[in-house]
């Protein structure tokens, strides 16, 4: 940071920030994990930091605001010591608006204090796994905008207190997904993904992409391919899910010439294509799917909508359509002790179902709105304008004359969809230009 910027920041040191809204919507949820022993939830967002609830979603507290980054890619609670929480920063879905991170963080007191544990140049950490000794595996995607060597799978040895890169392909290939066998913490699957975001297009896939498996905690890896039943040719992004009730059943959503769902019934040794119907909605962006903790054939697939299969992925029906809750879904926590309870995160915030997905409740008090740009006009009192990711463009007052303070009713939605820039006309109060 330049000396000039630092000097300017000193002028604002004594100012207190205040929220002016709007509170009519939430924003993009990217990660969910739960300390079930104490009923503590952690929810990460694309640019709104990490939030904690000790009341199963009734009340929320921001616990990451003092850190150098607010984009969350992964959150993992230790099963051995539930007060230990790891957070990977950087959003793991690199569209045009992808937000980079600054490494991986650890809290040893349930989010009260944090320490950066390294991997600052990985840009995006989308998955974290922990073994039975609290050693950590981190899936680093790397920079979305060009080659960099800080990609792949990293292993943190708690006893030694240091990181080791245990899976690396090349400077353009990162790890987009990482799952651990629930019955064998030495067995992991890593989805390596070659990709690059450019201002004018996006390259997804290449010779670096592929599905890798280890059975010795990452000391050695085997790349799975056509011989094992996976598609030939260059692959794109791969999403992986292991059935908790039967870890020999493994699913993979594979972006390729024909994007399809694949299944292994022998722990990943051999694979067969299940279907290419009802899957593959923008696979570079949507690769999240989950298996019912109690039923190996019951799957939920997150994409523009939420789809459900009860026959091992052969057929899909709509669980959540475009209406009812916000579309574009990215995160899910399926209660392992009560599969009827499902928490789901999307571009509009957090939702919960307590009847297996038949009915859903929106969690209204998570202020995660992701503003791309803000502006203001010259009225008195002046108004603030902002374009929200997938939640419209809004106009609201900086302050009001009535005693109730700024209310949701004081805000006006100017346009729907993805909001970006709003430029008020300085000479005409009623004119605003939108991008």
Region roles according to the model:
Residues 4-435:
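Beta-propeller blade termini and top-face loops
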């Amino acid at each position: 940071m330049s000396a000039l910027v630092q000097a300017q920041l000193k002028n604002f040191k004594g100012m207190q920030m205040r929220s002016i809204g709007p509170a009519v919507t939430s924003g993009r949820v990217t990660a969910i994990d739960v300390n079930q022993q104490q009923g503590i939830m952690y929810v990460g967002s694309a640019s709104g930091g990490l939030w904690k609830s000790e009341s199963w979603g009734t009340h929320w507290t921001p616990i990451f605001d003092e850190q150098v980054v607010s984009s969350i890619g992964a959150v993992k609670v230790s099963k051995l010591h539930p007060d230990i929480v790891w957070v990977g920063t950087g959003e793991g879905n690199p569209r045009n608006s992808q937000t980079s991170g600054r490494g991986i963080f650890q809290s040893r007191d349930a989010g009260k204090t944090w320490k950066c544990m390294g991997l600052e140049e990985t840009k995006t950490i989308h998955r974290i796994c922990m073994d039975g000794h609290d050693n950590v595996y981190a899936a680093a995607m790397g920079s979305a905008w060009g080659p960099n060597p800080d990609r792949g799978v990293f292993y943190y040895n708690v006893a030694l207190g240091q990181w080791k890169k245990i899976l690396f392909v090349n400077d353009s290939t990162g790890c987009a997904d990482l799952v651990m066998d629930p019955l064998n913490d030495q067995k992991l699957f890593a989805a390596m993904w070659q990709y690059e975001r450019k201002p004018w297009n996006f390259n997804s896939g290449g010779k670096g992409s592929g599905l890798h498996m280890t059975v010795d905690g990452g000391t050695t890896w085997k790349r799975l391919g056509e011989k094992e039943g996976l598609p030939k040719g260059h692959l794109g992004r791969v999403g992986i899910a292991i059935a908790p009730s039967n870890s020999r059943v493994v699913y993979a959503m594979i972006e390729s010439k024909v994007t399809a769902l694949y299944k292994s019934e022998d722990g990943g040794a051999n694979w067969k294509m299940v279907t290419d119907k009802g899957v593959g909605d923008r696979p570079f962006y949507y690769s999240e799917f989950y298996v019912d903790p109690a039923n190996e054939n019951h799957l939920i697939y997150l994409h523009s909508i939420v789809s459900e299969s009860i026959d091992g992925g052969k057929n899909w029906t709509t669980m959540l359509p475009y209406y009812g809750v916000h579309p574009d879904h990215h995160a899910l926590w399926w209660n392992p002790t009560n599969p009827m309870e499902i928490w789901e995160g999307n571009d509009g915030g957090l939702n919960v179902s307590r009847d297996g997905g038949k009915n859903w409740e929106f969690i209204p008090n998570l202020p995660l709105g992701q503003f791309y740009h803000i502006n203001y006009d010259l009225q008195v009192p002046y108004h603030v304008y902002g374009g929200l990711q997938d939640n419209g463009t809004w106009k609201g007052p900086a302050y009001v004359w009535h005693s109730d303070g700024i209310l949701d009713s004081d805000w006006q939605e100017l346009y729907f969809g993805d909001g970006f820039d709003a430029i008020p006309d300085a000479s005409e109060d009623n004119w605003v230009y939108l991008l």
